[in-house]
A protein has these predicted regions:
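Alpha-helical transmembrane-bundle signature of multi-pass membrane transport and export proteins
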Residues: 2-424
Length: 424
């Protein structure tokens, strides 16, 4: 079995160990990949605001907001392990391009619905099922390909800059989505579809990259190999399951349309601002990490970031102030970014390249469950407890998860350096 680092591109003599976090953009493949991912994220974030507001305006049902996440998660869960094996067996670059193309088709269908008019929400949920299927193949390939696009000494910078660009799109996307929604949903869907077309073109320009391929035919044994790897690597299991349960309980994103409408009394533009702030906090944090990476007490940093997320959720459920909600969501995004940064580096450093896609698939299951399934859980809890009580419960549960994981995974909380640093 090859070393997890063996498939990284070799650095040339001219590649300096610059402290400039943006120096990694000199690698053409990475720059194109980053552009495609950023454009696609921007488009999807715009669509998310439009879909959430459109569905809630049509039904005024908190449960329907939860169904938005469930419609994406179920096909994602059904296909993700197979998609992980595909990311290890086939060209990851082509898989990302095909997944982006499928997302583009979903955007065009939403645009068609907006032009023809909708009297029911089920066509939107049908498109979200297709989108969840595309995301199943997008996730593992997107995560696994990054380590093949840059030399070893630039990998942590690539992770931080990739996260930065993602969260910049998360900042700009909801704001633009809320702004353009003032002209109607068709405007949002038209612009997002154009962005997805550009993303497909960018990804098609990425040249073939060197990667280890899975050997042998697909079987349940090979498909489940990533799951076995994660289960046996307890520190990896602890890191990705921490994110799963913390965001599963603490994620209040699905409830933001109702919070904006019923508690803060703001419109779609204000909702866009709320959706922007977690990304703003995460982007600023990730830019800082690109220049000042975490190298010591990484486990404590990760747990602290999740704790900040939980505390912010409690404050969010307690306030009726739009300004306070904006500040709290900003801090929640920063805390979440610290956790994401540590988890991503830990998983990539620990994973051999020939099973990287399948391990990324497991990681994607945990992320998808925390996000989309968390949205469904939020909708159900809000229906039972009420909007603000559901948010408060989620924040308290997140803090409980942090405490429990400190006890259940002591190696994670005590982790001082990343594994590759310990070997130096």
């Amino acid at each position: 079995m090859q070393s997890p680092r063996a498939l990284l591109p070799k650095a040339s003599m001219s590649d300096s160990h610059s402290n400039n976090g943006f120096s990694v953009l000199r690698h053409r493949n990475f720059a194109l990949y980053l552009s495609a991912r950023t454009l696609a994220t921007l488009a999807v974030q715009m669509q998310n605001v439009a879909i959430g507001w459109q569905v809630y305006s049509m039904t005024h049902n908190l449960f329907d907001l939860g169904l938005i996440g469930l419609a994406q998660f179920l096909p994602f869960l059904a296909l993700i392990l197979i998609a992980g094996h595909a990311a290890d067996r086939y060209d990851r670059r082509n898989l990302v391009a095909l997944a982006l193309f499928a997302q583009m088709l979903c955007g065009l269908m939403l645009l068609l619905f907006a032009y023809t008019g909708l009297s029911a929400v089920w066509p939107i949920f049908a498109v979200l099922v297709l989108y969840g299927s595309a995301r199943a193949f997008m996730g593992p390939a997107t995560q696994a390909i990054l380590v093949n696009l840059v030399p070893q000494q630039d990998f942590s910078k690539a992770v931080a800059l990739s996260s930065s660009s993602f969260h910049v799109a998360v900042i700009v996307g909801p704001s633009l989505g809320g702004l353009f929604y003032l002209a109607g949903p068709k405007t949002v869907y038209m612009i997002s579809s154009v962005l997805l077309v550009l993303a497909v073109i960018m990804m098609c320009l990425v040249k073939s990259v060197k990667q280890a391929s899975a050997s042998g035919p697909a079987s349940w044994h090979t498909v489940l190999e990533g799951l076995r790897f994660v289960w046996n690597k307890k520190i990896v299991l602890g890191a990705i399951s921490l994110d799963l349960f913390a965001v599963l309980f603490g994620g209040a994103t699905a409830l933001l349309p109702a919070l904006a409408h019923d508690v803060l009394h703001i419109g779609p533009n204000g909702l866009g601002a709320l959706r922007t702030m977690p990304g703003a906090g995460a982007a600023l944090c990730s830019i800082a990490l690109a220049f000042f990476p975490i190298t010591r007490r990484v486990g404590a940093w990760m747990l602290g970031g999740v704790a900040l997320f939980g505390l912010g959720t409690i404050v969010l459920g307690s306030t009726t102030s739009f300004v306070v909600a904006l500040v709290v969501l900003f801090l929640m995004g920063a805390g979440d970014m610290i956790s994401v940064y540590v988890r991503h580096l830990l998983v990539q450093y620990e994973t051999p390249d020939e099973i990287r896609g399948r391990v990324s698939a497991v990681n994607s299951v945990f992320i998808g469950a925390s996000n989309e399934l968390g949205e469904f859980e939020s909708g159900i809890t809000a229906g039972w407890l009420g909007l603000t009580r559901a948010i408060l419960f989620g924040g308290a549960a997140t803090l409980g998860v942090v405490g429990a994981w400190t006890v259940l995974f002591p190696a994670l909380s005590r982790m001082d350096r990343f594994p590759h640093d310990d070997k130096k």
